[in-house]
């Protein structure tokens, strides 16, 4: 039982005049932001009353959002995919049926269910149905290998697995002793129940809410080893949505093409934000740059959510192909998931207009900062500034804040920090702020620049080098499509830089030309000693370069921790 004196202390603290004033200010700001999105559409008074009742019953969960939208926007499209469209009413009834059937099979509150699906209606329906049951949903990365899947499913004690039929071979080892269901059917030979069958036969009546909402578990990218499960509770209020809306001008009831994988923290964040705004999701199972432009022309979305490598693939299309499609409906292209090179941001906006918004964060920290088109024009490569209610500070290795302009480890505080790893442990935490695992600096205008991973810093001849600076410079070369830089062992200097470069089509760029180019723009110790040309860089499903696949077998780490830095304060808080 909780200490009654602690309860009294918290109650007294909440009644402090400054706390009350801050809470009132936040509520006023929330209303203003939501009104700005067009959130308040004309609705009959009786429907408003019932919507409030549903919100109280289901809280800010996918189950609650679709229950409310089935009432207030019943005939609006909720999802558009390769099978057609589903209205909010249809999706609500279908997920009722699915939830009833899963419940009949023994799936219930606080049970863990693994979902391995691409972007399509069954991902959404599985998510909503499990939310209606109060189950915890574990999203599996579709790029994982079989052993990784089996290890994660066992570690997370999943009682059931829902997956697309194309992953049958990958999940084989994870299926033993667990209920299994097929989501998207690539053929009609499934020997186990399919979500389509459960939806067709299930009871479509409404369910009672669970005693507590289920959690969402997003897996880390696993670029440095076995992915960890990052658990996150459902938001208690609309503050997280308002934080993002304070920097990204999304509107209610608009179409959003979510190209970023929904199982990834960025794709799922956009999905969650769309729940608040009653968005229509346009989903494609596979990303293809030209097919994506064709989908924009066909479905006329006003928003597109992508990862940087998707923008890169679009910009690598021949100019005549890019301009073949009418993309004028787009007014927001939101990008996240990995570093956005400044040159890519500039070239994309030159082609498609100043509609690009770059969100920087991590699976554990959710978001830290957002760069608007104005930020990206003024300072290409910036990660932007913290949105409302978010704090970003930089600390050295002695946990002291660095002086203004200095480089330090990035820590963030916001409304949606994760609850911790499901296997135990947490990220580094200072004064309630969570490490993103990156290092960076803040310029005189308060803009954050991410210089690289904390554990990727290369120490060569006593000099500290962050690969991102060299990679960004290489990417700006006319003959370079993409590049990655790592540190490899060197007897004389401790480490030396090695660049892995993908040439642009038709380029005959040599390693010496690249070295000369870097030398003319950066300090000598930042010039790669070796350059290896490749057809493509190894990437995971969200576009991050998997650098451990580039490192020599005997050198699976590529850096030391940053040296100690000054303790002078350099922080930023945006309200």
Task: Indicate where each model-derived feature is located.
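Structural core segment of the AMP-binding/adenylate-forming
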Residues: 1-34, 104-105, 128, 132-201, ...
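Conserved AMP-binding/adenylate-forming core of the ANL superfamily
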Residues: 58-59, 75-120, 124-128, 145-150
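Conserved AMP-binding A3 loop
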Residues: 87-89, 215-239
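Conserved structural elements of the adenylate-forming
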Residues: 92-97, 230-251, 312
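AMP-binding/adenylate-forming catalytic core of the ANL superfamily
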Residues: 144, 161-163, 294-296, 304, ...
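Conserved AMP-binding/adenylation subdomain of ANL enzymes
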Residues: 238-255, 263-303, 317
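Gly/Ser/Thr-rich phosphate-binding loop
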Residues: 276, 302-305, 319-379, 391, ...
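Conserved ATP/PPi-binding loop(s) of AMP-dependent carboxylate-activating enzymes
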Residues: 385-389, 398-431, 463-465
């Amino acid at each position: 039982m909780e200490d009654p004196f602690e309860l009294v202390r918290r109650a007294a603290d909440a009644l402090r005049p400054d706390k009350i004033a801050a809470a009132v200010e936040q509520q006023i700001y929330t209303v203003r932001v939501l009104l700005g999105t067009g959130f308040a559409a004309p609705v009959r008074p009786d429907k408003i009353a019932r919507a409030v009742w549903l919100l109280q019953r289901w809280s800010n969960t996918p189950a609650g959002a679709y229950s409310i939208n089935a009432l207030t926007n019943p005939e609006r499209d909720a999802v558009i995919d390769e099978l057609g469209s589903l209205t909010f009413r249809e999706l609500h009834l279908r997920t009722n049926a699915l939830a009833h059937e899963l419940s009949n099979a023994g799936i219930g509150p606080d049970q863990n269910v693994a979902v391995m699906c691409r972007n399509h209606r069954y991902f959404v329906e599985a998510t909503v149905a499990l939310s209606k049951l109060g189950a915890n949903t574990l999203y599996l990365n579709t790029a994982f290998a079989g052993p990784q899947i089996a290890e994660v499913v066992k570690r997370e004690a999943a009682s059931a697995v829902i997956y697309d039929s194309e992953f049958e071979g990958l999940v084989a080892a994870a299926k033993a002793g667990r209920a299994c269901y097929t989501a998207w059917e690539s053929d009609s030979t499934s020997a186990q129940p399919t979500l389509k069958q459960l939806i067709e036969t299930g009871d479509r009546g409404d369910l009672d809410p669970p005693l507590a909402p289920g959690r969402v578990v997003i897996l880390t990218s696993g670029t440095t080893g076995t992915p960890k499960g990052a658990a996150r509770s459902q938001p208690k209020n609309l503050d997280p949505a308002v934080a993002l809306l304070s920097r990204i001008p999304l509107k209610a009831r608009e179409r959003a093409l979510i190209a970023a994988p929904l199982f990834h923290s960025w794709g799922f964040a956009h999905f969650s934000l769309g729940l608040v705004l009653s968005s229509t999701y346009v989903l494609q199972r596979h990303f293809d740059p030209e097919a994506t432009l064709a989908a924009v022309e066909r479905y006329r979305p006003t928003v597109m959510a992508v990862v940087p490598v998707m923008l890169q693939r679009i910009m690598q299309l021949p100019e005549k192909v890019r301009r073949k499609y009418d993309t004028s409906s787009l007014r927001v292209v939101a990008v996240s998931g990995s570093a956005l090179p400044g040159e890519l941001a500039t070239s994309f906006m030159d082609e498609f207009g100043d509609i690009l918004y770059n969100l920087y964060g991590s699976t554990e920290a959710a978001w830290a900062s957002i760069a608007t088109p104005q930020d990206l024009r003024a300072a290409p490569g910036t990660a932007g500034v913290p949105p409302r209610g978010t704090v970003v500070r930089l600390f050295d290795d002695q946990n002291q804040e660095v002086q203004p302009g200095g480089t330090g480890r990035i820590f963030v505080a916001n409304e949606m920090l994760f609850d911790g790893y499901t296997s135990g442990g947490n990220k580094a935490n200072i004064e309630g702020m969570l490490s993103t695992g990156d290092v960076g600096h803040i310029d005189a205008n308060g803009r954050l620049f991410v210089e690289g991973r904390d554990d990727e810093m290369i120490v060569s001849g006593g000099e500290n080098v962050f690969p991102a600076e060299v990679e960004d410079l290489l990417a700006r070369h006319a003959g370079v499509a993409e590049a990655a830089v790592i540190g490899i062992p060197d007897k004389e200097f401790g480490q030396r830089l090695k660049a892995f470069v993908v040439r642009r089509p038709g380029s005959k760029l040599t390693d010496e030309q690249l070295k000369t180019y870097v030398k003319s723009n950066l300090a000598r110790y930042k010039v790669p000693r070796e350059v290896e040309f490749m057809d493509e860089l190894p990437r995971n499903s969200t576009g991050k370069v998997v650098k451990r696949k580039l490192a020599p077998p005997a050198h699976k780490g590529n850096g030391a921790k940053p040296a100690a830095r000054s303790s002078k304060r350099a922080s930023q808080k945006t309200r």
